[in-house]
């Protein structure tokens, strides 16, 4: 006999989709060199858990731990891998850039009315990692990935390696309080500190 069963889908926690780090040893001219690699799948931030007042994950905290771990292993440089990273939280990319630069603006956001909001490094000059670094990108690196790469380039903090990026250039606002779910609206464009739109200027190594 057939019957109807109602199921409510819970939030899926993608535990394997967080920041990962590792070391790579390279031998050159008979001398061994140790480098670090940090893989960032997206600029994630658990807004729901933060609003609920419970423990939450964020890419900036996970990346900070990765930098500290690699520093303890005395790596000679770090490669930040942003390949296939579609982007994510603007606040998180600003926090992450604060880990590798001393201070300053990191991106400009302009809305349809011409209002400009500048996101800055707000950690008071604290720099978790000051060593040599590079950023690896590809065609699927978009949005926050491009903001991160652009700021690294603007501050001459490291080199950009890889293919041309997406060139997305737009930012979204998420509405969570709708009666039947959520909606994401594209309302803004983001610009490098040098005023170039990332839709007009994509990044390639």
Predicted features along the sequence, with ranges:
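Cleft-lining beta-strand/loop regions that shape enzyme active-site pockets
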Residues: 1-178, 193
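Residue-level detector of conserved catalytic or cofactor/ligand-binding positions
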Residues: 192-204
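Short acidic, Pro/Gly- and aromatic-enriched capping/linker segments at domain boundaries
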Residues: 177-189
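Short hydrophobic-aromatic micro-motifs
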Residues: 36-38, 184-185, 199
């Amino acid at each position: 006999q057939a019957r109807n069963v109602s199921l409510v889908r819970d939030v899926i926690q993608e535990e394997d989709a967080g920041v990962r780090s590792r070391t790579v040893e390279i031998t050159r001219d008979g001398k061994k060199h140790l480098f670090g690699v940090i893989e960032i799948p997206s600029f994630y931030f658990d807004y729901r858990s933060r609003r609920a007042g419970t423990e939450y994950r964020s890419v900036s905290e996970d990346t900070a731990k990765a930098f500290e771990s690699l520093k303890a292993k005395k790596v000679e440089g770090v490669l930040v891998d942003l390949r296939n990273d579609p982007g994510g939280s603007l606040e998180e990319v600003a926090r992450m850039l604060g880990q590798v630069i001393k201070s300053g603006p990191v991106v400009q956001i302009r809305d349809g009315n011409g209002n400009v909001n500048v996101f800055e490094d707000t950690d008071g000059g604290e720099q978790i990692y000051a060593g040599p670094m590079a950023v690896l990108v590809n065609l699927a690196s978009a949005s926050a990935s491009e903001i991160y790469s652009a700021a690294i380039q603007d501050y001459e903090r490291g080199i950009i390696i890889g293919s041309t990026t997406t060139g997305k250039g737009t930012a979204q606002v998420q509405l969570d309080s709708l009666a039947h779910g959520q909606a994401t609206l594209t309302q803004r464009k983001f610009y490098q500190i040098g005023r170039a739109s990332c839709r007009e200027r994509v990044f390639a190594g």
